[in-house]
Design a protein with these regions (language model features):
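N-terminal core-binding DNA-recognition domain of tyrosine recombinases/integrases
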Residues: 12-27, 37-127
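Short, charged, low-complexity amphipathic alpha-helix
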Residues: 1-2
């Protein structure tokens, strides 16, 4: 079950879009939420917005859209590298997270028009 109260509004809007317009399954929505929450927690640490390093204690509700607008492809690569180095994530796991990030940024830039630049546009799928 997704607790929408823990998410920033733009993430909840994306999840609503995937349910209503893309007709994704509840499982897919849950995975998108998990993947993107993990990514946003990483961004919060990476951008030095928190001193907390325990991801289970990091909140994402307060990450403003202005921070999302600052994310570059290098930051996404840093996240995928973090998954490899910290969690020894396999390529399939990283590929799913990359896909979630790609769909999220496509929504923000092309559908919701909340950001001008899509940093995931040239993101390749990990192999």
């Amino acid at each position: 079950m997704i607790n929408h109260e823990n998410n920033p509004d733009y993430l909840n809007s994306f999840l609503d879009y995937t349910v209503t317009i893309l007709n994704k399954s509840p499982n897919t929505i849950k995975e998108y939420n998990y993947d993107l929450a993990t990514f946003l927690k990483f961004i919060k640490v990476h951008f030095k917005m928190t001193d907390e390093e325990d991801f289970s204690k990091i909140t994402i509700k307060d990450i403003p859209l202005s921070t999302i607008k600052q994310i570059k492809l290098d930051d996404i690569h840093a996240f995928l590298s973090y998954l490899t180095n910290t969690y020894h994530s396999k390529a399939a796991t990283r590929a799913r997270k990359a896909s979630s990030i790609r769909v999220f940024f496509n929504y923000l830039s092309q559908k919701a028009n909340l950001i001008e630049f899509n940093p995931a546009q040239n993101l390749e799928t990990p192999k």
